[in-house]
Structure formats: C-alpha cells, structure tokens
Amino acid sequence: MEPESIEICPYNPHHRIPLSRFQYHLASCRKKNPKKAKKMASCKYNACHVVPIRKLAEHEATCVNRSSVEEEDTLGPLQVSLPQPQNQDTLQVRWLSNPDIWNVDGANCHPMFVLKSFVPQKLVCESDIQESRGGDQCPEDPQTRTRKANF
C-alpha cells in the first residue's frame, strides 16, 4: 500500500496532516486561530489551498487546479438568445369544430385547453400518512385476532 501524502497546515506549520483529513483539519484549525485566519484566504479552485490574502491573486493565477473552463470570463451574465418565431399565428393551437358536438351555443368560440406549466406536488395516500404518524392503525378483531380494514 502506498503511503498517503502529508500536508502542512497553513495556520500552524508544526501540524502535518494526511491529505484525506486535511479539509477537516483546516476547518478546526481556522476556528482555533481566528487572528491568523483573518489574514488568510482560500483559493477559488481548491478550498484546501489556504494562502495569505496578499498572495491570493498570485496563487490563483498559477494554481494547479485551475482549468480552461474557469479561465473564461464567468463574471458577466450568461448571454442566451432564442430564435424569434416568424409567424405567431402558426404557433397557436386552433380550435377545430367537432361534428359530434351540436346544439351548443358558442361551441366554436372557446380555444382548446393547453396546460402551459405544471407544478408537481407530492402525492401521498392517506394510509401512508397514518402509518408514518403511528396512529389510527386498523383495529384488531378480538375473536379472530385479525385486522379489520377501515373502509
């Protein structure tokens, strides 16, 4: 088995921590050293890279975890353009009269119902709710020792 790499704590150089525990150690050591923590900053490419604030820009420019995607200008809003429909009438759903419907006033005046948005809601059976609460369970029949349904 290969030995795990050891990292040096930026808050206390006497602390030598295995890489697998380094993130947890940084959080606890930051709390224990609030004065030193105010002078330090985390790299935006790797939270385990904690450097002095004055050296942060230099570190981020040369950080090994920096990728080409992050080098693009991500500070501005994302520009998205949607194609404009050329003819609005072609997109609308038209109501076609049904020959089976007769003797109804204004049958051709109402457009077809189209659901434009759907907000899903959690659907739960009442029996599931009762079981999760632990109450109102089916009572037992004392003669047969079987449960009766509450219908």
UniProtKB/Swiss-Prot annotation:
SUPFAM superfamilies to which the protein is assigned, alphabetical: beta-beta-alpha zinc fingers (SSF57667)
Keywords, in A-Z order: Metal-binding, Repeat, Zinc, Zinc-finger
Residues binding Zn(2+) 1, per UniProt: C9, H15, H25, C29
Start-end of CHHC U11-48K-type zinc fingers: 6-33, 40-67
Location of region: Disordered: 130-151
A Pfam cross-reference name: zf-U11-48K
InterPro entries reported for this sequence: TRM13/UPF0224_CHHC_Znf_dom, UPF0224_FAM112_RNA_Proc, Znf_C2H2_sf
Gene Ontology molecular function: any one: protein-containing complex binding
Binding site for Zn(2+) 2: C43, H49, H59, C63
Family assignment from sequence similarity: Belongs to the UPF0224 (FAM112) family.
Protein known as: Gametocyte-specific factor 1-like
